[in-house]
Amino acid sequence: MLQPARQKFRKMQKGRNKGIATTGNKVSFGEFGLKAIGRGRLTARQIEAARRVMTRHIKRGGRVWIRVFPDQPISKKPAEVRMGNGKGSTEYYIAQIQPGKMLYEMDGVSEELAREAFRLAAAKLPIETTFITRHIGS
C-alpha cells in the first residue's frame, strides 16, 4: 500500500477540504482518465483496491498511472481508552480529494475496455467520479 517513506511531522490536524482542484485536473500521462467530481478522502487501501481491479480487468494490456498519493496521517485511539492522554497513534494514510482531481489514468487499451475498468474501479471508491478522454491537439 502507498504511504510516505518519511515525514516531517508524524501527526497532522484534521483541517478542511475546500475548493476545487487547480493542479492534477487534466489527463497528463495516458489517453483516458478517472476524474473526481465529488469531494472526500481516499485511504491507501481504497486506492490500492481500485488499482487492482483495473489492472486485473485490462489483463496485462496497457498501463495505469495513479495520480493521487495518501500523504496525510490519520490517528486513532485504541478501543475503550479514556479521553485525554494525548493524540492517538497513526492508523492509516489518506489523500484529500477535491472536485476535478484526476485519480487514475490509463493508456494502451481501447476506450470500451478503459471505460469498463474505470467503472469497476469507481465502485471501490467512496466519491463520485467520471470518465475523461484526452483531446488530441489541446
UniProtKB/Swiss-Prot annotation:
Which sequence ranges form a coiled-coil region, renumbered to this chain? Answer: none
Q: Which CDD domains does its entry note?
A: Ribosomal_L16_L10e (cd01433)
Any Gene Ontology CC annotation: cytosolic large ribosomal subunit
Note down the stretches annotated as region Disordered. Answer: 1-22
Supply the alphabetized keyword list.
Ribonucleoprotein, Ribosomal protein, RNA-binding, rRNA-binding, tRNA-binding
Q: Which InterPro entries match?
A: Ribosomal_uL16 (IPR047873), Ribosomal_uL16_bact-type (IPR000114), Ribosomal_uL16_CS (IPR020798), Ribosomal_uL16_dom (IPR016180), Ribosomal_uL16_sf (IPR036920)
Q: What Pfam families would the database entry show?
A: Ribosomal_L16
Q: Where is the composition biased (Basic residues)?
A: 7-17
Q: Name one GO molecular function term.
A: structural constituent of ribosome
Name the GO terms of the biological process aspect.
Answer: translation
Question: Which NCBIfam families does UniProt cross-reference here?
Answer: rplP_bact
The subunit field of the Swiss-Prot or TrEMBL record says: Part of the 50S ribosomal subunit.
State the family it belongs to: Belongs to the universal ribosomal protein uL16 family.
User: What this chain does, per the record?
Assistant: Binds 23S rRNA and is also seen to make contacts with the A and possibly P site tRNAs.
Q: Please name the HAMAP family in this protein's record.
A: Ribosomal_uL16
Entry protein name = Large ribosomal subunit protein uL16
**Organism name:** Methylobacillus flagellatus (strain ATCC 51484 / DSM 6875 / VKM B-1610 / KT)
Taxonomic placement: Bacteria, Pseudomonadati, Pseudomonadota, Betaproteobacteria, Nitrosomonadales
**Chain's gene name:** rplP
